[in-house]
UniProtKB/Swiss-Prot annotation:
This is Small ribosomal subunit protein uS11. One of its GO terms (cellular component) is ribonucleoprotein complex. The gene is rpsK. It comes from Prochlorococcus marinus (strain MIT 9215). GO terms for biological process: translation. One of its GO terms (molecular function) is structural constituent of ribosome.
């Protein structure tokens, strides 16, 4: 009978991080929520695609809500209580993701819009004619 081999690999430790920063990138096609500590190390992340949505449904507000809830659940397990929210992009899931973080039990101290605005940089794509 074969002997069982004990694994000696490093197990991810649960650290206690009370404060953090939530980055919400909301595009027309997807919403990505990543939660980091104040120094920038990512604690948890989720996206509409990782939450099981495919295709056009990834850009919906409900998909953004589901992604934010999943990321918040993992951050709460690490002991996070207070967050600052940085929102980037024009997508439909911006407000819904923020509301989902609040309902999950995280206390929001700041909401900042960090959407990049070009000072007449690259040429825009031509208009769609449908």
């Amino acid at each position: 009978m074969a002997a069982t081999v004990k694994k000696t690999g490093s197990k991810k430790s649960k650290r206690n991080v009370p404060n953090g920063v939530v980055h919400i990138q909301s595009t027309f096609n997807n919403t990505i929520v990543s939660i980091s500590d104040t120094s920038g190390h990512v604690i948890s992340w989720s996206s509409a695609g990782a939450s099981g949505f495919k295709g056009a449904r990834k850009g919906t507000p409900f998909a953004a809500q589901t992604a934010a809830e999943a990321a918040a659940r993992r951050a709460l397990d690490q002991g996070m209580r207070q967050i600052e929210v940085l929102v980037r992009g024009p997508g439909a899931g911006r407000e819904t993701a923020i509301r989902a973080l609040q309902v999950a039990g995280l206390e929001i101290t700041l909401i900042r819009d960090v959407t990049p605005l070009p000072h007449n940089g690259c040429r825009r794509p031509k208009r769609r004619r449908v």
